[in-house]
Amino acid sequence: MSATILDGKATKNTIFEELRPRVARLAEQGRTPGLATVLVGDDPASHSYVRAKHNDCAKVGINSIRKELPADASQSDVEAVVDELNADPACHGYIIQLPLPEQLDAGPLLERIAPEKDADGLHPISLGRLVLGEQAPLPCTPRGIIELLRRYDVPLAGARVAVVGRGITVGRPIGLLLTRRSENATVTLCHTGTKDLAEEVRRADIVVAAAGRPHLITADMVRPGAAVLDVGVTRTDSGLAGDVHPDVAEVAGFLSPNPGGIGPMTRAMLLSNVVEAAERAAS
């Protein structure tokens, strides 16, 4: 058996096509959505990530707002930019690109973002509202995972899901999303304290691997026909490696590879959050 590939790139392009008319309608009202990025320093990877986000904006018709500061920027310098974006009606959502230079404290800066402009969906208030079932921007990567599964008709209601990794970006929030009534999955959150990881994974209909450990999930751990999503990524001597061993493709029913799976979906959900924020502001 060879797994059906959950193609994040193709799905991202489809979502972009769906966003374009929504953006155009807002533009006709003089309310073109705007995504801002705050980039501090000269890290090549950060510049590449930010450039990709703004290229995505151009494809959909979203306005790009770029705020770039030197590597020696102070905490107050970045705070001033955050305050400016919070007050800018042309900005409907923004991100502070991480990592930041070592002299900066990321936590207070991220909390300073106006919750309604939290494009990543990871502001403490956004996560609190998610727990309460209230409207808020959703975390981009978990939202992208669920959207990808839905687009390929992978059943969620009643499914047993093993989430491997308990990070704030994916592991913890995806459990909140998957256990909403709209999804109705049963979630097991696995981590370094899990006694028998292989057994927990083997019971699952859906596996979300987000531990950041190369090839942690092997073929013998996966139930035949299960959906496996490789989210974690690690830089090794031979290049980037995901959490899922390539041999899993011969056992799984569905596989979201890394790269090409969840990364593009995260970018699509970032733009979706911004468009939805603009629509709320216009209503």
Curated annotation (Swiss-Prot):
Catalytic activity: (6R)-5,10-methylene-5,6,7,8-tetrahydrofolate + NADP(+) = (6R)-5,10-methenyltetrahydrofolate + NADPH; (6R)-5,10-methenyltetrahydrofolate + H2O = (6R)-10-formyltetrahydrofolate + H(+)
Keywords: Amino-acid biosynthesis, Histidine biosynthesis, Hydrolase, Methionine biosynthesis, Multifunctional enzyme, NADP, One-carbon metabolism, Oxidoreductase, Purine biosynthesis
EC number(s) recorded for this UniProt protein: 1.5.1.5, 3.5.4.9
UniProt keyword Nucleotide-binding, yes or no: no
Any single biological process term in GO: tetrahydrofolate interconversion
SUPFAM superfamilies for the chain: Aminoacid dehydrogenase-like, N-terminal domain (SSF53223), NAD(P)-binding Rossmann-fold domains (SSF51735)
Binding positions (NADP(+)): G165, R166, G167, T192, V233
Pfam families registered for this protein in UniProt: THF_DHG_CYH, THF_DHG_CYH_C
UniProt family annotation: Belongs to the tetrahydrofolate dehydrogenase/cyclohydrolase family.
Quaternary context: Homodimer.
Function of the protein: Catalyzes the oxidation of 5,10-methylenetetrahydrofolate to 5,10-methenyltetrahydrofolate and then the hydrolysis of 5,10-methenyltetrahydrofolate to 10-formyltetrahydrofolate.
Protein name: Bifunctional protein FolD 2
Organism: Saccharopolyspora erythraea (strain ATCC 11635 / DSM 40517 / JCM 4748 / NBRC 13426 / NCIMB 8594 / NRRL 2338)
